[in-house]
């Protein structure tokens, strides 16, 4: 990525028994560095529904997008990672 290119957006996907707030200590400093960040908030109904919600979230941020998934969120980003706007995925 050259200095003329914009930074990727980052979409965080939480694991079971968690919510998007678990990423707050990461989001604040990343936003301070100029990254657009959003924590997807899904209801853990079915994986297909959660993937659909993350794909909709990808549509709300600037491209390209980096998906970050923790635990169950890794399954979700695997499903959502087929979107053409996804530049990479991080599993934690």
PLM regions and their residue ranges:
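A conserved short beta-strand
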Residues: 85-92
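Generic preference for hydrophobic/aromatic residues in regular secondary structure cores
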Residues: 62, 77-79
